[in-house]
Amino acid sequence: MVAPDGDVLVAATYREPLDLGGGPLPFNHVSNAPHLVVARFSPGGTLRWAHGLTPAMASTRARVGGLAVDGEGNVWLGGTSAGFTLGARELPAGPFLARLSPQGALERVRRFDGEGTLAINALAPDGTGGVVVAGDFSGQRHFGDAVRQAPEGQRSAFVVSLDGHGQTRWSRVWSARAEGLVTARAVAVDVFGGVYVTGAYAGGVCFGGPALVTVRQRTPFALKLSPEGAHVWSRDLRGTEGTASAVAVGPDRVFVGGNFSGRFYFRGEPHTSSGAQGFVAAFDAAGKERWARSFAATASALATDDAGQLTLVGSHDGGLDLGARGGAPAGLYVARLHPEDGASLWVRTFSSPSAPQARSVAVDLGGHAVVAGALARIYPEGTPYPRPRDGFLLRLKP
């Protein structure tokens, strides 16, 4: 995530002693449970500050669900706390949302009380100092404006809009019919306050417009809400199995990315995959289909720049067909696409002998792409799990 001043924010979990350049972070040597780190770097990669949070409860697994930066440089962090303490304040075990100042001081902590499980999967700044939270839950939760109930034995998707003080403006919940599910995996907000959500559903679901129905285990969807949370439009990639795990917005464009198998039609053109492949689909702000691309790679994260160009990151097994010259060895890729037709402007590939993962991408005001992810280590056969990965930050010129 990139702040307005070009600084780079990152949040992750760690299981080994860690030093990001400012000295060793706190580490509980008697626990193999995940720790959590949030850090801020300068545009040149110099550490400004970092917080390492140690687990106090082995029964709750720490998790990073989302990271966002508002226009003032405040940092919003969402996920699951394992009984963390930051400064003199506690983050009780369970789902949490916290706001940190640009200097890293903890300012606010918000919880969503209830029963069952809740996963925060994505955050997006709303342009007014607040944040929009997306995820899924089971059981019952109080989102601040109402108590929401997921059908017994099912997971339902939720979106909550909060102001800069962490108070709820509105919340929305979507549940599937019968034995289905709905999960929200990504969220973005445009300059007019419109909220865009992507994820997957099974069975049948009504987001506020015509009902969507699938016979697949999971089918990708995208939807738009007004600034007040009213349904504007909803779409799915009918005929496919997969998840829309990324979304980004530009001038009159909504870009949706993820992975799929099966076949879908976009503007009358078929996109077919017998195994898991990546896709990017572009809509205009009214939900009209503009273009789509599918390719032999994952589509992990999306970001747009001031020109509306789309930056896409993921991993591939050597069959990348986004426009890389020559045979591209398996590894990571970063691609920039034209917003009008999806044509590749440039593609960079980075080979790796292990299985790399690109987790997020952002573009700063200068057009630099910043990618965060993880690299798998090579272990001897029989090494027990969990097997730690090494995190990385990568900054590319425009």
Whereabouts are the PLM-identified features?
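A sequence-level/structural motif corresponding to short, flexible coil/turn segments enriched
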Residues: 1-398
